[in-house]
A protein has these predicted regions:
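Bacterial N-terminal signal peptides
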Residues: 9-19
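Structural beta->alpha junctions
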Residues: 41-42, 277-281
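Short, internal active-site loops enriched in acidic
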Residues: 7, 73-76, 309-312
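Bacterial N-terminal signal peptides that target proteins for export
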Residues: 1-9
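Sec/Tat signal peptide C-region and signal peptidase I cleavage site
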Residues: 20-24
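Conserved hydrophobic/amphipathic secondary-structure segments
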Residues: 26-271, 329, 343-349
Length: 350
C-alpha cells in the first residue's frame, strides 16, 4: 500500500548493547521501526498533536524504536481505521491515530469495516476541546440574526464524517441556518486559505487553532465568530473573545436535540485515539500502553504540546478511554438522529 507522505522520526541506528533487560536480552523494540498510521494530512492541528507525542513515545518505549509516520487521509478516518483493523500486522509495530473512528462506527457509516470494540486503545492527548463557528468578514454577518437570514451559506469542511464536518453541521442545524451548503474535500490549512479567498463562506474550527495559526483573522476583523462548542460542557475557553460566545446547546429546542449533541460531545471526549490492531500480542500492547501513560504524565510533554498546538494537553489514559467507549450512549433513536446530522444528506428538520 502506498501512503501519501512519510516522515521518519528518530535516529536510524541505535547501539545494540544499550537497553538490554536484566536477563541480557535486548528489548523487543530495540532497532525496530514502528509505523504510526495517521488518518489525516501533514501540517494541520492533528499533525502537530502527533509531532508532540512522538519524541516522548520513543523515550518511554524500551529500546527507543524509530517511528515512521504514514499519512493516510480518506473517508473521515475510515480508510486508516479499516487498514489498521484488517490489514496491519498485530505485531506491535503498527499504531494508528484516527479521528472519527468511534463516531463512524456508532453511526453505522458506510465504509466502516471494523469492530470498534476489538481495537486495543492506548489513550489520547486531547480529551477536551473548543470549536467555534466563523464566517468570512466580508459577508457582514456580524450577528446571529443576520447569520440566520443569509441563505445558502457555504460551510467548508474535510470529509463527511470528520469531526470538523460534523461540528459545522451541528452549528448550522442548531443555530438555524437557511439552506446551508456543505463543501468538503479540504485539509484544515486549505480551509483557512479558501475562507480568505471567498471560495467558502464559513467553517467550524478548533478555537486554539484560530489563535495559534490564524490570530490575524480575529485582530484584523477578517472573520465573525458566532458560537462555541464546549467539550466537556461547561469548560469555558480562557480567551475573552471566545468566553463570551453562546454555547451551542443554548439553541437546542428539545431533549432529543440535546441528547444528540451530548452524544457528539462524548465522541469528541475520546479525542483522536491511538489504537492497535486487534490481536496484538498482550505483552507488546502493555509496553505501548505504559509508554503512553508515561508520555501523558510527563510535564515536558505538556510544554511541547502547548508549544506546537497552542492548546493545553488534556490526556485520556488507556483505561479511561476503554471505559469511555464502553459507556458511550448507543440509544437507537439518538444514534439515528446523529447519523442524519453527520451524514451527507440534507440536515434533518426540527
Amino acid at each position: 500500500m502506498k501512503f501519501k507522505t512519510r516522515l521518519l522520526v528518530g535516529g536510524l541506528f541505535l547501539p545494540l548493547l544499550l537497553g538490554r533487560n536484566v536477563h541480557g536480552q535486548a528489548p523487543f523494540y530495540q532497532g525496530k521501526t514502528i509505523a504510526l498510521i495517521q488518518a489525516g494530512e501533514a501540517g494541520g492541528t492533528g499533525d502537530m498533536r502527533v509531532k508532540a507525542v512522538i519524541p516522548f513515545l520513543r523515550k518511554y518505549i524500551p529500546g527507543n524504536p524509530n517511528i515512521l509516520v504514514e499519512y493516510m487521509p480518506g473517508g473521515g478516518g475510515r480508510k486508516a481505521a479499516n487498514y489498521i483493523f484488517g490489514s496491519a500486522r498485530p505485531d506491535g509495530l503498527t499504531i494508528g491515530t484516527v479521528g472519527g473512528v468511534v463516531a463512524n462506527a456508532i453511526q453505522g457509516q458506510a465504509g466502516v469495516q471494523y469492530d470498534l470494540d476489538k481495537f486495543i486503545y492506548l489513550g489520547a492527548p486531547n480529551a477536551t476541546s473548543h470549536y467555534v463557528f466563523v464566517t468570512r468578514g466580508e459577508l457582514g454577518l456580524n450577528s446571529l440574526e443576520k447569520l440566520r437570514a443569509h441563505a445558502g451559506l457555504r460551510v467548508g469542511a474535510h470529509a463527511v464524517g470528520h469531526f470538523v464536518y460534523i461540528t459545522g453541521r451541528f452549528f448550522a442545524w442548531l443555530i438555524g441556518l437557511r439552506d446551508p451548503r456543505f463543501v468538503t474535500g479540504y485539509s484544515g490549512v486549505e480551509l483557512d486559505a479558501n475562507l480568505l479567498r471567498g471560495e467558502i463562506d464559513s467553517r467550524a474550527n478548533i478555537a486554539d487553532t484560530v489563535l495559534q495559526r490564524n490570530a490575524e483573522l480575529l485582530t484584523k476583523g477578517l472573520v465573525h465568530v458566532h458560537a462555541i462548542l464546549e467539550i466537556p460542557k461547561g469548560d469555558k475557553h480562557p480567551h475573552p473573545r471566545f468566553a463570551s460566545l453562546p454555547e451551542i446547546e443554548r439553541f437546542a429546542r428539545s431533549d432529543k436535540e440535546s441528547k444528540a449533541l451530548a452524544m457528539f460531545r462524548a465522541f469528541r471526549l475520546v479525542g483522536t485515539p491511538y489504537i492497535l490492531p486487534p490481536g496484538t500480542l498482550q505483552e507488546r500492547a502493555e509496553i505501548l500502553r505504559e509508554a503512553f501513560r508515561k508520555t501523558f504524565r510527563d510535564p515536558e510533554f505538556h510544554k511541547e504540546y502547548k508549544k506546537l498546538t497552542g492548546d493545553d494537553a488534556a490526556p485520556l489514559l488507556p483505561e479511561e478511554m476503554e471505559k469511555a467507549i464502553r459507556e458511550l450512549p448507543r440509544e437507537r433513536e439518538i444514534v439515528e438522529l446523529f447519523q442524519k446530522i453527520a451524514g451527507p444528506d440534507a440536515l434533518p428538520p426540527r
